[in-house]
Amino acid sequence: MGDNVFLEPDPWASSSNWGSPVKPLNYKTAIGNSSIPLQYRNYWDVFQANNVLLFPEEESYSDIFHVPQDVMKEFFTLIESSSNQPLRQIQFFVLLALVACYQLGVPSTLEQIFKQRNVLPILQRFNPELFNRSSDNETPLFPNNSPPASTTALNLSSNIVPSINESKILEQEDDDVSNKSLPHAQQSIIRSFPDIQKQPKGFFSYPSSTVSSIAPSTLEAGNLHSQQPPKFSVDSSVDDNAITPRKPFSKIPNRLSPSTQPLLSNSRHSSFRLASSSTSFPASLEMNVDIDLEPSGYFFYRHNNYIISDSSNTREVLRRYSDFFWLHSYLMKKYPFRRVPLIPLKKFHFAKRNASTQNSFLEHRRQELSDFVNDLSHHPIFSNDEVVRVFFTEPNVFKNWRRENQKRIDQEIEQFLVVPQSQVPDASETVKERLLKLNMSTTTAINNQLNIFRIFEKMIFTLQHFHEDFLRLQNSFNCLLDSGLYHQVFTSTFAQNESKIMSMASGHFYNIDSLLHQQNDAVKHTFLLGLSKEIKILISLRLLIERISEVFSTDLTKVRHTISNDENLLRETANSDESGRNRTFLNRSSKKRAENSLKSKKELYLKNLNQRYQIAHELEQELSYLQDYVFSLGNPYVEYCKQHVKLEEESLKIWHTLESDFSRLET
């Protein structure tokens, strides 16, 4: 989670011609820790070579980037530039990012950018090494009535998405320039600035062949993340394909079309066919869940959404808590004999207008949802489920998608759960014994893990009290030093010696307090988080055992005996009718009821027998998957011990340093 820099509304936004921007609290925060694109650094070298261009002149920059002067004036205000001093490097980078976002057209205001990714910085929204996949079905970035601009305008929006060579990006009208080195090409940009300044102002325009019409659904709030920057060129010699708009969700399922995705009814493991070609979900990627601090909805329906992205930032979707809850219910219904990860319980939460990452409820739910999605993404079966893949990749509102496809999803679940009418071996004895051992071991492990968790929570509480004590110690030492007591009462030599001792002790306790802070963070963020993940995994395993135990509550021996008795009764009745005897075992209505009862008992027996056989197979798979996942998480005890040993070694060094300082004073 980054710092939210767009919480302060801009009082002059109403008089702005650039929509309703929101002024960042600090432009330095806007740059954050994100990686600066290589092209931005190249432009910095180019502009630095010409000292005149580094001065924030609205007219010059407006002509270079084809941005209105009033907008450029707002940009200079945002980066806190001065007209009589050249731009610093960080100011220049932020300016390029703002210009790039403006050239994108959608979104067109900082407020909309904030809604897309409230944990800005702006540059962090776009990774220069990733969004390289093209898409022909992209909405236009600018209205059709935008004034045409020269193709020689320096467009920075694709600097965030460099998908062609730098030599081609910096290509001039002369064909031989593209074969030259990058610094020489950069110098050619400087030479082309006078020509650029003569061009008429306006937006950067795209050929009509590369831009499709705007669909109303693409402008919904849930689809804000699908708008991505295009490629660009500073010269008209670059072909039109170089400026095809791109987005991070280019090769993912958009929605399930009933006309193009028939169900595979002959297969038990049938799945949806996607309307567009979709890549397999990367199960090895770490998933991140962030809180969207901008609430959605009105009045009592106001809520906070959650931003799901993978570690490579190639995908980013917006989901509500109800979407997570629906997905959990879907998995429980479709995979009753597999370990479904835990999800935080439903609880009413009124989203405040200005949410904060310090909200304990939101942070606790975010952490649990993060564990949920990571457990899903590492599960070989769940990660390949089509509904799960759509959940992680569908950029539109997931609630609308699942409503449109609810009937087809229900049919898919019914076909998946159809029990084959075939005899399978009885796996009751082996599974029962395994379940008994698993139930005892998981219950014992959960109880012990919870006890350890509580003990370390008490340790954190104790460390916080130590921190308060050390603060009081430092204040006492500082008061002694500031009062000048030793210099007023005792001789100068003795007073200087005592003052040095007090200063050393104060510095020593400050260092110890810093180590306690590190130890506190190590317990909180390393050990307790890892331990809580293991506890939730064990609880989900125990819930799986409880669901499986319900299947074994049916006594198949009694069912077999009743089936045998009913068959004998019907056989005797049939023989009596054939022999023409006066006595009949069953009349016609009773015989019909007996036949129906026998049929239902046989179906129950076959279903239970197949379920036990399925459990025996899937239980071994789940334990194998669980072992691999826990191994990938790492042992929290080992990580904590490593950090604790490191901190203890640093603490020992501090004590040795203090001892050597005291020994030097005595000598």
Swiss-Prot record:
Q: Which residues form the PX domain?
A: 279-398
**What InterPro entries does the entry give?**
PX_dom, PX_dom_sf, SNX8/Mvp1, Snx8_BAR_dom
Q: Which domain of life is it from?
A: Eukaryota
Keywords, sorted A to Z: Cytoplasm, Endosome, Membrane, Protein transport, Transport
Biased composition regions of type Polar residues, renumbered to the chain = 224-236
Region (Disordered), start-end ranges: 221-268, 574-594
Compartments where located: Cytoplasm; Endosome membrane
Gene Ontology MF term list:
phosphatidylinositol binding; phosphatidylinositol-3-phosphate binding
* Entry binding sites for a 1,2-diacyl-sn-glycero-3-phospho-(1D-myo-inositol-3-phosphate): R320, S322, K346
Pfam families recorded: PX, Snx8_BAR_dom
Main site of residence?
A: cytoplasm
Topology in membrane = Peripheral membrane protein
Q: Give the family per the record.
A: Belongs to the sorting nexin family.
The free-text function statement in the UniProt record for this protein reads: Required for vacuolar protein sorting. Component of the retromer-mediated endosome-to-Golgi retrograde pathway. Required for efficient cargo export from the endosome, promoting Vps1-mediated fission of retromer-coated tubules that bud from the endosome.
- Domain characteristics, as noted in the entry: The PX domain binds phosphatidylinositol 3-phosphate, which is necessary for peripheral membrane localization.
- What is the name listed in the Swiss-Prot or TrEMBL entry for this protein? Sorting nexin mvp1
